[in-house]
Amino acid sequence: MRALRVSGHLVANLLLAAAAARAQSLPPRDQWQRAPSILEAMKIAGGQRVADVAAGSGYLTRFLAAKVGTTGRVFAVEVSDEALGALRELVKHDSLTNVEVLAGTETDPKLPGSLDGAVILNSYHEMTQHQAMLQAIKLALRPGALLVVVDNAAIAGWFTARDDQASHHALDPKYAVEELRNAGFEIVDRQDAFIVEPYAQWMIVARRP
């Protein structure tokens, strides 16, 4: 009997389709995304100024706003008009008076300086100009401040090239570690199994020297 050959791209697409179908029955995000642990890793406190880079729908922005309090400031960054509109609507709807929505670019989040921390949640793999973005974030952080990156883990054994992984919305953490170091960050923590279910996600904590 002739063996059936299945391409890696086909299998990956099938896995993504299965994941999309499974998403209909996923538990609420608050039960698995581990937002409190992400904030703990950032080591931020009330009254501080932090950035949510590629903030998306603003899921983590709400947690950051509560953490830094009314005397702190959260800069929620997005690029597309649609995402910026969604963030502004969230800020208005939830009365997040300590959140400022910023329109960034693919290479520059347009952040103010001397920030006490920054985070990129589930979006690092989407950044096509990651080195320029990391450099800009580093310059916006005060010395000693932390950048926390959380993203989807690549499916083991299917794709090794960075671009192939990113096109399937995942990334091997080794690429992020290398890129963070190239941008001048120090790696202070790496958790390859930060989240196991329903999605495999890693977390890297990097410090601006």
Predicted features along the sequence, with ranges:
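A short acidic, Gly/Pro-enriched loop at the edge of an enzyme's catalytic core
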Residues: 109-118
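Conserved alpha-helix/loop element of class I SAM-dependent methyltransferases that forms part
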Residues: 31-46
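A short glycine-rich, Lys/Arg-flanked "PGG" loop and its adjoining helix->strand segment in the class I
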Residues: 65, 131-146
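Short alpha-helix
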Residues: 169-183, 190
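Core SAM-dependent methyltransferase catalytic element
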Residues: 189-209
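Class I SAM-dependent methyltransferase Rossmann-like catalytic core
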Residues: 23-33
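Conserved class I S-adenosyl-L-methionine
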Residues: 148-175
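Class I SAM-dependent methyltransferase SAM/SAH-binding core
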Residues: 51, 57-109
